[in-house]
UniProtKB/Swiss-Prot annotation:
PROSITE patterns in the record: AP2_ERF
GO molecular function: DNA binding; DNA-binding transcription factor activity
GO terms for cellular component: nucleus
Source organism, top-level taxon: Eukaryota
Main localization category: nucleus
Protein name (record): Dehydration-responsive element-binding protein 1
Pfam families referenced in this protein's UniProt entry, alphabetically: AP2 (PF00847)
Family: Belongs to the AP2/ERF transcription factor family. ERF subfamily.
Key words, A-Z: Activator, DNA-binding, Nucleus, Stress response, Transcription, Transcription regulation
Function: Transcriptional activator that binds specifically to the DNA sequence 5'-[AG]CCGAC-3'.
Family annotation (SMART domains): AP2
Organism field: Pseudotsuga menziesii
InterPro entries assigned to the protein according to its UniProt record, in alphabetical order: AP2/ERF_dom (IPR001471), AP2/ERF_dom_sf (IPR036955), DNA-bd_dom_sf (IPR016177), DRE1A-I (IPR045277)
Annotated DNA-binding residue span(s): 15-46
């Protein structure tokens, strides 16, 4: 399943699954297990 092809053109940076930009300008990364609702937190990046 492609993750956000339209957003790629709008924001001009690659969109990775589980990676998003917060309002504060920091990138956050997390992974979700398909069978569970729990998330594995990978961290925050500038």
């Amino acid at each position: 399943k492609p993750a956000g092809r339209k957003k790629f053109q709008e924001t001009r940076h690659p969109i990775y699954r589980g990676v998003r930009l917060r309002k504060s300008g920091k990138w956050v990364c997390e992974v979700r297990e398909p069978n569970k609702k729990s998330r594995i937190w990978l961290g925050t990046f500038k």
